Amino acid sequence: MSGESSRSLGKGSAPPGPVPEGQIRVYSMRFCPFAQRTLMVLKAKGIRHEVININLKNKPEWFFEKNPLGLVPVLENSQGHLVTESVITCEYLDEAYPEKKLFPDDPYKKARQKMTLESFSKVPPLIASFVRSKRKEDSPNLREALENEFKKLEEGMDNYKSFLGGDSPSMVDYLTWPWFQRLEALELKECLAHTPKLKLWMAAMQQDPVASSHKIDAKTYREYLNLYLQDSPEACDYGL
């Protein structure tokens, strides 16, 4: 089965056939923010693609041939070429399909976007630590650390327009959005209390057709996380 909302393939499943000519395939998981990066770039660029969801708690044996680490996202083209790691997949798509560039051509502007991404890079591990934290006393420290990272991002928005890279969404917006989109479901939105520019940016992103097409239902996401943290093989298909 294929499609963003399709059930995932697990251990014992047959591997999918070759990628059709003129398409690209992405191995994904419905709730994964890293895979969401790749899916958003595919949509933003209008690239024909198919989605194969992988059960990350019950991985198919053949998937390790696509990525020995067993992680999503993975891109595969009709030539059998494989690309892994979310940021690398997005850069590959921007270069392999140059019709609608998401990174700016100007070297300095592109460097600025990459500097913002470097500043943002501490956010996903902090959110992951918060999700996995079993001790309530850890929560305030993690919240404070996350708030500080958001303040650093805010300080870098000196030439702020509607979006992080200018007047319209670009690569830096799509590479950061999945974690901001999950703040409400994780009850972390108050960490933005002292970053008004980031809050305005979030409001602008919610109006973007690509960003808004990836819905995160708070209750469903929390139930998924509960199952995922218990290593349940049912987690990745929760809600289907």
UniProtKB/Swiss-Prot annotation:
Family annotation (Pfam families): GST_C, GST_N_2
Catalytic activity: RX + glutathione = an S-substituted glutathione + a halide anion + H(+); L-dehydroascorbate + 2 glutathione = glutathione disulfide + L-ascorbate; methylarsonate + 2 glutathione + H(+) = methylarsonous acid + glutathione disulfide + H2O
N-acetylserine, modified sites: 2
Taxonomic superkingdom: Eukaryota
UniProt keywords, alphabetically: Acetylation, Cytoplasm, Oxidoreductase, Phosphoprotein, Transferase
Domain GST C-terminal as annotated: residue spans: 106-227
InterPro entries in UniProt: Glutathione-S-Trfase_C-like, Glutathione-S-Trfase_C_sf, Glutathione_S-Trfase, Glutathione_S-Trfase_N, GST_C, GST_omega, GST_Omega/HSP26, Thioredoxin-like_sf
Quaternary data: Homodimer.
Name of this chain's protein: Glutathione S-transferase omega-1
Role description: Exhibits glutathione-dependent thiol transferase and dehydroascorbate reductase activities. Has S-(phenacyl)glutathione reductase activity. Also has glutathione S-transferase activity. Participates in the biotransformation of inorganic arsenic and reduces monomethylarsonic acid (MMA) and dimethylarsonic acid.
PANTHER family: GLUTATHIONE S-TRANSFERASE OMEGA-1, PTHR43968
Modified residues (Phosphoserine): 129
